[in-house]
Amino acid sequence: MLYPLNLELCGRRCTVIGGGRVAERKIGALLAAGAVVTVIAPTLTAHLQQLAASKRIQWEAALYRPGMLVASSPVLVFCTADDAHANGLAVAEARAIGALVNAAAEPKQSDFQVPSRIHHGDFLLTVSTGGGSPAFSRLLREQLEEEYPESFGQFVERLVRIRQELRDRGGGSMLHQVIWRKVMDKRIIDLVRAGQLDLAEEEIRHGVIDAGAES
């Protein structure tokens, strides 16, 4: 069983083996997370060449060979090369240096899987089949994108402010948990989905006041 985890990668080193379309997708997500990315591949897609030229990624223009991961000491390694032998060698070296590895074509060789995801600001939903069927994960993600539009990310920003205001009033974490359980219900989700953020926030604020008075 895989352990679900949201990982802070800002400023952390990650290495991608291979320079094709799969690598391009992995690298795009890593850069968005603030990772420092090295790609090892004899050739790159046009987009990755642009990233290398602009110094957004470091490019080692060679087919992977043992010893190439030691210099960068990555925390994560993604093996996406077309050469299965090179991928296998990279998996072995990644484990030897203590890095976690994802082998795109061989889920059983992977230490972790990258789920399909919906990302609106701090609002993040992920779907995974453990590498069993990426296509099914994408299908589920597409359905969830319709059910959870950008308004959910916008509402999370409001909830952060309300939560901080509640903390500033004091009362302790246990009391706050009781209050949040009382004010959060399906109606809030329906309002946010409909884009009625002001009304949803108003209901939350009224609920917080009422729940606080009862506690």
Task: Kindly give the residue locations of the regions a language model identified.
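Short acidic/histidine-rich motifs immediately flanking catalytic phosphotransfer sites
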Residues: 55, 71-76
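Hydrophobic beta-strand scaffold residues
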Residues: 37, 59, 100-101
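An accessory alpha-helical subdomain
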Residues: 131-215
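Conserved SAM/SAH-binding loop
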Residues: 62-66
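E1/E1-like adenylate-forming module used to activate ubiquitin-like modifiers
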Residues: 82, 103-153
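Hydrophobic, well-ordered beta-alpha structural blocks that scaffold small-molecule cofactor pockets
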Residues: 1-51
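Residue-level detector of alpha-helix initiation sites
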Residues: 21-22, 84-85, 131
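ADP-ribose/adenylate-binding Rossmann-like module
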Residues: 76-82, 87-114
